Structure formats: C-alpha cells, structure tokens
C-alpha cells in the first residue's frame, strides 16, 4: 500500500475530519510517521488565529524539502476554506486544496491535478463519516456542522459554513458502532453543541441536545460522555439538570467566556453579558460541586479598556476555572473586527501575562486540593518513565506507574502528588 503522512492542527473537529480522511483513503493508503517515505502528505489546518495560518506555510515549505519524488502535498481544513487559490499562489508545489466541509472529496482530490474545493454550502454527504478512529478508547462523534453565531472576531462561519444538525439516528448509529469496536467514551463535537436541533434539514426528526445526551447515555457499553463546545447562551435549566444528574456525562464543562466585560461581550456579539455568564457558572458549581470548568479568554480585544480587563479578572477570580485557553486578540479576515485598531502589543502582552499568572495561582491551589482524593480514571495513554495516564470523570489528567495492560480500563486511583498540569497516584484496586 501507499503511505500517508497526516498532520492535524487545531481543534477536536479537525481531529475528527482527519479520521474521516484516513477512512476515505484506507483502501489505498496507510499512515506513516516518516514523511520522507510518504506518497501523500496532508496538513489539516486551523485558522482561528493568525499564528496557525503562518505555521501552515512554514510547515508545507519544510515538507516540500524532504518529500520523495512523485509524492503529493495537500492542504485541508479551515485555512484551505478561506485562502483557497491563494495557497497555490504562495506554494505552487501544493497539489490540491480541500476546505473544511470538503474532506469527503479527498479521493477525487488525490487523483486530480491542482484540485480545489472550498464550498461551504450544505451537503448531506458530509454526514457520512468514516469509521477510522485515532484512538481505540474514545470516539469523536460530530453532531453538527458549521456555525451561525457571527461573533465579531471569529472566522469559523466563513470556513465551516452555516450550522446544520446531523440527524440523531446517524449520531446514535455512529456511537453504537464505536462502542462495539471497543470505545467506552463518546466525545460529541460541534461549534455550539447545546444549540443542537435548531437547524435540521426538514425531513428529520427534531431533538434537542439534552434529549440527545440522554439517548446516547442509554446505548449499551457507553460509560462516559464528553462534549465540546457548548455556548453559554444556550445553557438553559434543562441542559444543566441533565448534565448534573446523568451518571454517564462526565462532569467537565467548557464555558467559553471570551471576556468578562459586558461592553466587550456586546462588541464581540456574544449574546450574553457578564451577569448571565456568572449566573450559569456559579449555578453549575452549586449543582455539581465536583465539576471542572474550562474556558476561552481573548485579551486586548480592540475595544477592551483597563476596566474591561479588570472585569475579566473578576470573573476569573469568582469562577476559578480549572483550565483556560487564553490568547491576545488576533484579527481574522472576513470578520467584523478585522479592521479595528489594535491595542498596543506591549499592553496586550502584559494583560495576557497578568491573566495567565493569576490563573496559575488558582490552578496550583485546585490541584493541591485533589491530593488524597480517589478518582475513577480511564487510562488511554502510555507516558515516559513507565507511566500510564488517563482522565478522571472531572477531566483531571492522572498518571500512575504501570504498563500498557492498563490501557482501556477504568480504575480507582488515590492521588498522592500534584503538579500544575498532572495528578500522580496509585491504583487502589
């Protein structure tokens, strides 16, 4: 068989798209880690910030230097969606370009010189994901495609198109097959998962996200359910009740804050304010004390003042997130905020440093407080020094001494030591 080298940048949805690519090519290609031997070299791209876009061109330039004669290079994903032909202009050695909603055309692209497809219109063939899984222990399952939110800073609606919910019967069938193949954890994917069910093609049965969670939890063999990314605006009482009460749903919630300032949130077109976010987050803490909450934060949005930044710090200190993904504002093409005057980079960098430093203090305290507790850990990863790692039900990364026979098992672990990112312990059974 021919050899495929595949590099994936960005979010879990890109990981699932890459799995789809491998499934589409499985009859002709098998994966390799050696790029110099690959017959086909693919990079699946991210465009949420400017840095991954720059990385694309540096990476494919490096690929071109080590590729073997006769091999092909393809660019897929979100950057392919919005740059399109420009990729050929900047890197004429690239053989084809496939947008984020066009990966099902990979077989055609490989066989067609200078093939390009960046259409973001709805096509029901997008629902037919292949069965290849990068991990035998958990299954990423798309429940929706695209986004209709139009946040002022975000390019995703321009790269992934309008929001469409995948019919529940397709999702449930995919989850059932994954469990039959050994997965114990189902990880649901979408830009705004808790808006699921708002936009179906008309002939499909209507179902909201809360009902979908219940249906998946009833599949025999499903032991854990995770999902990303919910939108704070759609965290209604029904959703919170099912999240906290269903024993199959992992008690970790990603709540993308973006800013703690009501003014900046309005400028970002987020649809909620500081008070709404705090109400949802603190209610969740009260309903489910063991929950871990992660978030996204953008500092130095063009309209962010010092007082606005202080509002963000207030939310950080009040919610005490277990994890934050924080970045300086990065202007993206085709967005409402693209041409707004930027805040001085020194000020932006300082705000990011203050935010991350304070969160490190919060995280150190959180991790220290886990010592002595017992967590059920789902082991998925071999680490260095004879260790095996996995995730607790609340999404803490836990590492123990052990061998590969632990992989795929859920076992109780008593936590004995904590670093900022990892808990260390011993299996108690």
Curated annotation (Swiss-Prot):
<feature type="binding site">
    <location>
        <position position="46"/>
    </location>
    <ligand>
        <name>[4Fe-4S] cluster 1</name>
    </ligand>
</feature>
<keyword id="KW-0408">Iron</keyword>
<keyword id="KW-0963">Cytoplasm</keyword>
<feature type="binding site">
    <location>
        <position position="147"/>
    </location>
    <ligand>
        <name>[4Fe-4S] cluster 2</name>
    </ligand>
</feature>
<dbReference type="GO" id="GO:0046872">
    <property type="term" value="F:metal ion binding"/>
</dbReference>
<dbReference type="InterPro" id="IPR013848">
    <property type="entry name" value="Methylthiotransferase_N"/>
</dbReference>
<keyword id="KW-0808">Transferase</keyword>
<feature type="domain" description="TRAM">
    <location>
        <begin position="368"/>
        <end position="429"/>
    </location>
</feature>
<dbReference type="GO" id="GO:0035597">
    <property type="term" value="F:N6-isopentenyladenosine methylthiotransferase activity"/>
</dbReference>
<dbReference type="InterPro" id="IPR006463">
    <property type="entry name" value="MiaB_methiolase"/>
</dbReference>
<protein>
    <recommendedName>
        <fullName>tRNA-2-methylthio-N(6)-dimethylallyladenosine synthase</fullName>
        <ecNumber>2.8.4.3</ecNumber>
    </recommendedName>
</protein>
<dbReference type="InterPro" id="IPR007197">
    <property type="entry name" value="rSAM"/>
</dbReference>
<dbReference type="Pfam" id="PF00919">
    <property type="entry name" value="UPF0004"/>
</dbReference>
<feature type="binding site">
    <location>
        <position position="154"/>
    </location>
    <ligand>
        <name>[4Fe-4S] cluster 2</name>
    </ligand>
</feature>
<feature type="binding site">
    <location>
        <position position="151"/>
    </location>
    <ligand>
        <name>[4Fe-4S] cluster 2</name>
    </ligand>
</feature>
<keyword id="KW-0479">Metal-binding</keyword>
<comment type="similarity">
    <text>Belongs to the methylthiotransferase family. MiaB subfamily.</text>
</comment>
<dbReference type="InterPro" id="IPR038135">
    <property type="entry name" value="Methylthiotransferase_N_sf"/>
</dbReference>
<comment type="function">
    <text>Catalyzes the methylthiolation of N6-(dimethylallyl)adenosine (i(6)A), leading to the formation of 2-methylthio-N6-(dimethylallyl)adenosine (ms(2)i(6)A) at position 37 in tRNAs that read codons beginning with uridine.</text>
</comment>
<dbReference type="Pfam" id="PF04055">
    <property type="entry name" value="Radical_SAM"/>
</dbReference>
<feature type="binding site">
    <location>
        <position position="11"/>
    </location>
    <ligand>
        <name>[4Fe-4S] cluster 1</name>
    </ligand>
</feature>
<dbReference type="Pfam" id="PF01938">
    <property type="entry name" value="TRAM"/>
</dbReference>
<keyword id="KW-0819">tRNA processing</keyword>
<feature type="binding site">
    <location>
        <position position="78"/>
    </location>
    <ligand>
        <name>[4Fe-4S] cluster 1</name>
    </ligand>
</feature>
<feature type="domain" description="Radical SAM core">
    <location>
        <begin position="133"/>
        <end position="365"/>
    </location>
</feature>
<comment type="subunit">
    <text>Monomer.</text>
</comment>
<keyword id="KW-0004">4Fe-4S</keyword>
<dbReference type="InterPro" id="IPR023404">
    <property type="entry name" value="rSAM_horseshoe"/>
</dbReference>
<keyword id="KW-0411">Iron-sulfur</keyword>
<dbReference type="InterPro" id="IPR020612">
    <property type="entry name" value="Methylthiotransferase_CS"/>
</dbReference>
<feature type="domain" description="MTTase N-terminal">
    <location>
        <begin position="2"/>
        <end position="115"/>
    </location>
</feature>
<keyword id="KW-0949">S-adenosyl-L-methionine</keyword>
<dbReference type="GO" id="GO:0051539">
    <property type="term" value="F:4 iron, 4 sulfur cluster binding"/>
</dbReference>
<dbReference type="GO" id="GO:0005829">
    <property type="term" value="C:cytosol"/>
</dbReference>
<dbReference type="InterPro" id="IPR002792">
    <property type="entry name" value="TRAM_dom"/>
</dbReference>
<dbReference type="InterPro" id="IPR005839">
    <property type="entry name" value="Methylthiotransferase"/>
</dbReference>
<dbReference type="InterPro" id="IPR006638">
    <property type="entry name" value="Elp3/MiaA/NifB-like_rSAM"/>
</dbReference>
């Amino acid at each position: 068989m021919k050899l495929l080298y595949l590099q994936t940048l960005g979010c879990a949805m890109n990981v699932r798209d890459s799995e789809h690519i491998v499934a589409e090519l499985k009859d002709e290609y098998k994966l390799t880690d050696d790029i110099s031997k690959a017959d086909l070299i693919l990079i699946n791209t991210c465009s949420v910030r400017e840095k991954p876009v720059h990385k694309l061109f540096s990476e494919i330039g490096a690929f071109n230097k080590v590729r073997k004669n006769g091999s092909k290079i393809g660019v897929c994903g979100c950057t392919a969606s919005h740059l399109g032909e420009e990729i050929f202009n900047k890197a004429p050695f690239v053989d084809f370009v496939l947008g984020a909603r066009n990966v099902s055309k990979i077989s055609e692209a490989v066989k067609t010189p200078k093939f390009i497809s960046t259409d973001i219109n709805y096509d029901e063939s997008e629902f037919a994901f292949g069965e290849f899984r990068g991990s035998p222990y958990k299954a990423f399952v798309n429940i929706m495609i695209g986004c209709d939110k139009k946040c002022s800073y975000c390019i995703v609606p321009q790269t992934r198109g309008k929001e469409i919910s995948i019919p529940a019967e397709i999702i449930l069938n995919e989850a059932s097959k994954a469990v039959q193949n050994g997965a114990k954890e189902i990880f649901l994917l979408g830009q705004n998962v808790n808006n699921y069910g708002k936009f179906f093609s008309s002939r499909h049965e209507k179902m909201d996200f809360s009902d979908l969670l219940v249906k998946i939890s009833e599949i025999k063999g499903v032991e854990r359910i995770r999902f990303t990314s919910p939108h704070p605006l759609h965290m209604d009482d029904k959703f919170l009740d099912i999240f906290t009460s269903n024993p199959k749903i992992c008690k970790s919630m990603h709540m993308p804050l973006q800013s703690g300032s009501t003014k900046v949130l309005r400028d970002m077109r987020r649809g909620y304010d500081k008070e709404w976010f705090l109400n949802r987050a603190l209610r969740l803490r009260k309903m489910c004390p063991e929950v871990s909450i992660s978030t996204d934060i953008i500092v130095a949005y063009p309209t962010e003042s010092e007082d606005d930044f202080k509002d963000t710090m207030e939310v950080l200190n009040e919610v005490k997130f277990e994890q934050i993904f924080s970045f300086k504002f990065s202007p993206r093409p085709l967005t409402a905020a693209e041409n707004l005057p930027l805040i001085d980079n020194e000020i932006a960098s300082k705000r990011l440093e203050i935010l991350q430093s304070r969160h490190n203090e919060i995280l150190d305290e959180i991790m220290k407080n886990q010592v002595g507790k017992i967590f059920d850990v789902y082991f998925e990863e071999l680490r260095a020094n004879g260790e095996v790692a996995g995730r607790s039900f609340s999404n803490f990364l836990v590492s123990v001494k052990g061998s590969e026979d632990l992989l795929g098992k859920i076992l109780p672990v008593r936590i004995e030591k904590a670093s900022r990112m990892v808990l260390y312990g011993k299996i108690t059974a």
